[in-house]
Regions:
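Active-site clefts of carbohydrate-active enzymes
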Residues: 260-301
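Short, acidic/polar
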Residues: 140-167, 309-313
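Aromatic- and acidic-residue-enriched segments that line the glycan-binding/catalytic groove
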Residues: 19-121, 217-225, 340, 344
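C-terminal beta-strand-rich structural cap/linker in extracellular carbohydrate-active enzymes
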Residues: 436-482
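Extracytoplasmic soluble-region selector
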Residues: 478-596
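Asparagine-centered strand-capping/turn motif at beta-strand->loop junctions
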Residues: 401-405
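Active-site-proximal helices and loops of the catalytic beta/alpha 8
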Residues: 20, 51-76, 158-164, 171-266, ...
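Short, small-residue-biased leader/transition segments that mark boundaries at the very start
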Residues: 2-9
Length: 596
């Protein structure tokens, strides 16, 4: 994929989360999934749970409990690497609680039925254990830096560290999730590792506020520019143009030039309300209770909001930085805050005019270097509804004017003072021209839209391949209902208890019922709570090994829904005698009879 993208001048940037992991990852392994898969490394949770159980039940010291834990896991599971146990804080004196403040108990593994020991979860979510920051820095935690960032940060040859491995496979950089929650020291070393392989590898941090400290050359190249989002949307919703320009100017003055021109200028993302819905009054609020009633659709979105999206897109494609379009915005996708903002792409259902607008703006930006790398000079006027700036380089000088009101506006600008000396200007969007005689120009700026003026003699022919845009709006490309994946909603077992004699086997796969019946991915996996009593293979074959009880947990691969079957194993019953239904039998020649 990466090679194919490179052939068409596209690049892949990998999304990286470096301060927390999934609770079912190999690093933490809360559900004991990796103990039996042959790996020589143990996750943090099984290890510390064993240690704390031993301390409590055997009344021994932590040191002795750790010694016994390593002896046990090495002997039983072949574990030789205990590095991940140092990456997390698991607490012996706290347990996880549910919403009712009741203790959460382990349902699988060695501790089935026992309370889950507490640990720090990202923003309180126990599904995402936090990497420990030793002395305030993840970089100083155990082997984390070596495994994640690399053994030799200056080597031009990639190692198997997380950071360098994926770059060596064709990735062109990293987007760092919740970047402000990781130490500066960690990112400084991370940068060395990334840039050692290729100085063009990009590093983009998720920062929602002023990011100047991250952009001084020792951490990131760019950030997700949420401050641009704030300025652009506030203006589009009727805010004073001066306030928007002041916000943008503060960024330009504070950020290093190299970073300023590389800003990831977004107006929405997977963490916000979608642009069109935000313009229609649905704010960022993951806890909103009225979403069922306010469920946004394109049809019930106001015409004003739809028109304002054209204005926001114009600012994105004409201002300094990298215009970043959240998938589907160009089609008119709607959505409230996370998770509603992550709906599936609406292929073939988008607004044709909007799709073509985004494509045209992209083509214009590609055609004029001034809009990509040219200088930026704000144009302040007396009309708070008109926002303007000049983009210029050695090739062109361009005046961008925008109007956030519901009515067209006639605007007069002294272009000579801005360095534009042409006698006639033209709008590169529409091709309409206007006189600049006397150094001033009067132009009509359309409602909720704008113009891009430049010397008429410098106007370039900009074309868009509309045929390639059809998947966005042509119903022929609409995904048919039968092609959509049907998500699993649950799993149950026809029999929740079975009894087996020692040495016998039974298959429980026929008892598994995945809902709904037409789910796309009905695959499940099996796990036993005690393999010494009853083991289970990937096909659901249960083998009774010793007298006792064990719980077989069935988990769907789609959605991770679970159901349980209790297995009771009894001693093998020895036959005391054999009895036949007949003790005497008379048969005619050629006849048969089956004894029972």
């Amino acid at each position: 994929v990466s090679r194919g993208l490179g052939d068409v001048y596209k690049r892949q940037v990998l999304d990286g989360v470096f301060n927390h992991v999934s609770d079912d990852s190999v690093y933490f392994d809360r559900y004991y999934e990796y103990l039996e898969d042959g790996t020589d490394t143990i996750g943090a949770y099984p290890y510390w749970a064993y240690v704390y159980d031993a301390m409590s039940e055997k009344k021994i010291s932590k040191e002795e409990a750790e010694k016994q834990a390593k002896e046990y896991f090495t002997a039983e599971y072949g574990i030789t690497n205990y590095d991940y146990t140092e990456w997390f804080d698991v607490f012996s004196d706290t347990t996880l609680k549910d919403d009712n403040d009741d203790e959460v108990c382990d349902s699988v593994g060695l501790r089935a039925g026992k309370p889950v020991y507490g640990y720090d979860g990202w923003w309180g979510y126990d599904s995402m254990p936090i990497i420990k920051a030793t002395n305030g820095s993840e970089y100083q935690t155990g082997t984390w830096a070596e495994e994640v960032i690399g053994k030799n940060e200056t080597s031009k040859t990639a190692d198997n560290s997380v950071t360098q491995y994926w770059l060596s496979k064709g990735m062109d950089g990293w987007r760092l999730d919740v970047a402000n929650e990781v130490s500066d020291e960690t990112w400084q070393h991370f940068r060395k590792s990334v840039k050692a392989l290729d100085s063009d590898n990009v590093i983009i941090g998720e920062i929602w506020t002023d990011a100047v400290k991250y952009l001084m050359g020792d951490m990131y190249d760019s950030v997700m520019n949420y401050m641009f989002r704030g300025a652009a949307i506030a203006y589009a919703k009727g805010g004073d143009s001066k306030n928007a320009l002041n916000t943008l100017e503060r960024l330009r003055e504070r950020y290093p030039k190299e970073a300023f021109y590389a800003m990831m200028n977004l107006v929405d993302s997977h963490d916000t309300t979608r642009l069109l819905s935000y313009l229609d009054g649905i704010d960022d609020d993951r806890n909103q209770k009225e979403i069922a009633e306010a469920f946004p659709t394109y049809e019930n979105t106001s015409d004003a909001a739809k028109q304002k999206q054209y204005l926001v897109a114009l600012m994105q494609f004409t201002y300094a930085g990298a215009p970043t379009i959240y998938y589907g915005d160009e089609l008119g996708m709607v959505g409230a805050d996370d998770p509603d903002d992550r709906r599936a792409m609406i292929w073939g259902e988008g607004n044709e005019n909007l799709v073509k607008w985004y494509a045209k703006l992209a083509a214009i930006r590609s055609s004029y270097s001034a809009l990509r790398t040219g200088s930026v000079e704000p144009v302040y006027g007396t009309d708070k509804e008109i926002l303007g700036y000049v983009r210029s380089d050695d090739s062109d000088i361009m005046l961008v004017l925008m109007n956030n009101s519901a009515a067209d506006k006639s605007v007069t600008v002294n272009v000579a003072e801005l360095g534009i000396n042409a006698a006639e200007l033209a709008d590169v969007i529409t091709g309409n021209s206007c006189s600049a005689a006397g150094g001033s120009v009067t132009v009509n700026v359309p409602a909720y839209n704008g113009v891009i003026l430049t010397d008429k003699g410098h106007v370039k022919q900009v074309s868009v391949d509309e045929e390639n845009l059809k998947p966005g709006f042509d119903p022929a490309y609409k995904i048919k209902a039968e092609e959509r994946a049907v998500k699993v909603t649950g799993v149950s077992l026809k029999k929740t208890e079975i009894t087996l004699q020692k040495g016998k086997t039974a298959n429980i796969s026929e008892n598994v019922v995945v809902a709904p019946q037409n789910a796309t991915n009905t695959a499940v996996k099996y796990k036993t709570s005690d393999k010494t009593v009853a083991s289970v293979d990937k096909d659901g074959n249960v083998t009774a090994n010793a007298k006792g009880t064990a719980t077989i947990t069935v988990t769907t691969k789609d959605g991770m829904f679970t159901s349980e079957c209790k297995v009771t194993v009894g001693d093998q019953v020895q036959a005391a005698k054999i009895k036949l239904n007949k003790t005497k039998l008379s048969l005619k020649k050629g006849k048969t009879y089956t004894l029972k």
